[in-house]
Amino acid sequence: MRSPQTSEKTHTMAKTLQNITDLTLQQLTGRLAEMKEPAWRAKQIHEWLFSHRAESFEEMTTLSKALRKALEETFAITPPEVEQHDNSTEGACPGPTEKLLLRLPDGAMIETVLIPGPGRLTACLSSQAGCALQCSFCATGSLGFKRNLTPGEITGQANALNSMLAASGREQKITNIVFMGMGEPLLNTLNVFDAVETLSTRGYTSSISQRKITISTVGIIPEIAKLATSGMKTKLAVSLHSAFQEKRESLMPLAARRYPLDELQPVLAHYAKNTGEPVTLVYMLLEGVNDTLEDARQLIRFASRFFCKINLIDYNSIVNIPFQSVCSETRDRFRDRLLEAGLQVTLRKSYGTSIHAACGQLAAKGMEHSNKS
């Protein structure tokens, strides 16, 4: 962790200089052309930033001193600072679930999570500080919306997780990314798209195929339409939680009213048809709320009209939020009804509940210290 003096200096620089990690390779190439530098320099610098995770231009020893000085006068490098590192090993999980509380240069706090699985290591990234959507089962919504994250603040989370792995001597590599952390990715679409472009750039030791990156949304219809024609190869997950409009409004009041199911369904069908990829419908089972066979039948009616798969997930307990998870018998009965209808269904196990790292639990623990200098 950097010293307070370093943090203060970095924050001051960030006020006047652009964070170079906010730039995609193409954007950096354009900026360097203005500095009369060849295009290949951009790839060289990006490799320092995202393969070697350099935190200063002085570390970029393959660049001339003159260029390093010019870069230092033009750009800043402002990685997030790790405020807290929690880990938890649970049940059949093949390794520890780890959560980092990160401080951004302006003092905003976010969380990112590393989730192990059989043959994979998934990074759960945040796209916003806080969230404006106020979903009733989600801790992040209780924070309110602070601001969108920049592309560099998004990729910086992956860098922080990779640095954590390297510091512990592990040779593991992040294999998958899910935008299921704090915030709504499709209310920060351009920055998320730029971050995906950087994270998936071939040739970096940390690069990840876009096919292994999932963007999760509450169902922002115009942005899903953009994603369908963007040419990106990412996967799409939609937080559904009920196929009854009125019930969905009670769970997700802002998103469900603004983007009703009868308008969302055809857009998801268009996405699936245009991309050839299934939409993942995420359905959190809540005891006595959305767990009946009638709920299952309504979900079948909604999901049978387009190429999709369904992830059933358990509710993860959150302080002051009065929902309960369903028992295994209820969950299995619900799943079996979907399977009988010919739908593809997966029961997703959540890990990291004891450290508040599971779905819906991210609330930037330590947010009360976000004004610390």
Curated annotation (Swiss-Prot):
Binds 1 [4Fe-4S] cluster. The cluster is coordinated with 3 cysteines and an exchangeable S-adenosyl-L-methionine. It is an enzyme of class 2 (transferase). It catalyses: adenosine(2503) in 23S rRNA + 2 reduced [2Fe-2S]-[ferredoxin] + 2 S-adenosyl-L-methionine = 2-methyladenosine(2503) in 23S rRNA + 5'-deoxyadenosine + L-methionine + 2 oxidized [2Fe-2S]-[ferredoxin] + S-adenosyl-L-homocysteine; adenosine(37) in tRNA + 2 reduced [2Fe-2S]-[ferredoxin] + 2 S-adenosyl-L-methionine = 2-methyladenosine(37) in tRNA + 5'-deoxyadenosine + L-methionine + 2 oxidized [2Fe-2S]-[ferredoxin] + S-adenosyl-L-homocysteine. Keywords: 4Fe-4S, Cytoplasm, Disulfide bond, Iron, Iron-sulfur, Metal-binding, Methyltransferase, rRNA processing, S-adenosyl-L-methionine, Transferase, tRNA processing. One of its GO terms (molecular function) is metal ion binding. Residues 117-356 form the Radical SAM core domain. Its cofactor is [4Fe-4S] cluster. Pfam families: Radical_SAM, RlmN_N. It is found in: Cytoplasm. S-adenosyl-L-methionine binds at G183, E184, S216, S239, L240, H241, N316. Disulfide bonds join C124-C359. One of its GO terms (biological process) is tRNA methylation. GO terms for cellular component: cytoplasm. Its EC number is 2.1.1.192. Its main location: cytoplasm. [4Fe-4S] cluster binds at C131, C135, C138. InterPro entries: Aldolase_TIM (IPR013785), Methyltransferase_A (IPR040072), RlmN_N (IPR048641), RNA_MTrfase_RlmN (IPR027492), rRNA_lsu_MTrfase_RlmN/Cfr (IPR004383), rSAM (IPR007197). The active site is at E111, C359. SUPFAM superfamilies: Radical SAM enzymes. HAMAP family: RNA_methyltr_RlmN. Specifically methylates position 2 of adenine 2503 in 23S rRNA and position 2 of adenine 37 in tRNAs. Belongs to the radical SAM superfamily. RlmN family. Reaction proceeds by a ping-pong mechanism involving intermediate methylation of a conserved cysteine residue. This is Probable dual-specificity RNA methyltransferase RlmN. The gene is rlmN.
